[in-house]
Regions:
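Helix-turn-helix
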Residues: 5, 9, 13, 17-51, ...
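Amphipathic, non-transmembrane alpha-helical scaffold segments
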Residues: 11, 57, 61, 82, ...
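Solvent-exposed, amphipathic alpha-helical segments
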Residues: 13-20, 67-74, 154, 158-166
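Short coil/turn segments at alpha/beta junctions that flank glycine-rich nucleotide-binding fingerprints
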Residues: 20-24, 75, 96, 140
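Hydrophobic alpha-helical connector segments
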Residues: 55, 69-95, 148-155
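Amphipathic alpha-helical packing segments from all-alpha helical-bundle domains
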Residues: 62-65, 69-70, 113-139, 149-153, ...
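C-terminal peripheral helix-coil segments that are non-catalytic and often amphipathic
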Residues: 88-91, 128-136, 157-192
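Short secondary-structure transition hinges
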Residues: 90-132, 139-143, 163
Length: 192
């Protein structure tokens, strides 16, 4: 149990440091110091810094991707899928806001960077989940055929921007009514 607690502490401290300084600006020694561990103790749990990053993805992002896929698959309609995806995405983002904001800023890291290599698969998975919503709704929206990826990117961008805006006010206020307003605005745009 102590090993698992230490491992989780390393992941949480790393999230905070990566959020505050960026992935490239943080070294393993700084993570070890903040965790009150020696470097060998940290290396017992993770081979290197990219191993920590992969641990973050496995511990926190993989389960979110599974939840997002489930809520979309269990939705009864196009609009229900959008709402359920957005509620899940926002609630997970607010629950672990620094992780979400770290990922949001770092997704624009250079294509060959360590971070990009670790995160691109997850980013693609999330985009594909949203894209599937639009692919399944082709019959509803005649203007959508061939533009599913554009719609998915715009939808994710709207949610992400609003999450960032609410955070910049130092208090995440993304609740059901805020998400409903975003969905309403998005639907108004695509139905016109």
């Amino acid at each position: 149990m102590a090993n698992e607690q230490t491992r989780l502490k390393i992941l949480q401290v790393s999230i905070e440091l990566f959020y505050e300084k960026g992935y490239d600006a943080v070294g393993v020694q700084e993570i070890a110091d903040k965790c009150e561990l020696t470097k060998p103790a940290l290396y017992y749990h993770f081979k290197n810094k990219s191993g920590i990053l992969e641990g973050i993805m496995q511990q926190y992002i993989d389960p979110v991707v599974v939840k997002l896929r489930e809520v979309v698959n269990n939705s009864s309609s196009f609009e229900d899928s959008l709402h359920n995806f957005a509620y899940c995405y926002v609630s997970e983002g607010c629950e672990n806001l620094h992780l979400y904001l770290m990922l949001m800023t770092m997704q624009y890291s250079p294509p060959m960077s360590e971070f990009n290599n670790a995160f691109i698969h997850h980013c693609t998975e999330i985009n594909n989940i949203v894209k599937s919503i639009f692919i399944n709704a082709r019959g509803l929206l005649g203007n959508m055929n061939g533009r599913e990826n554009q719609f998915a990117t715009t939808f994710l961008g709207m949610i992400g921007f609003h999450m960032y805006e609410y955070h910049s006010e130092k208090e995440p206020k993304m609740n059901k009514s805020a998400v409903d307003m975003i969905i309403h605005q998005f639907l108004h745009g695509i139905y016109s």
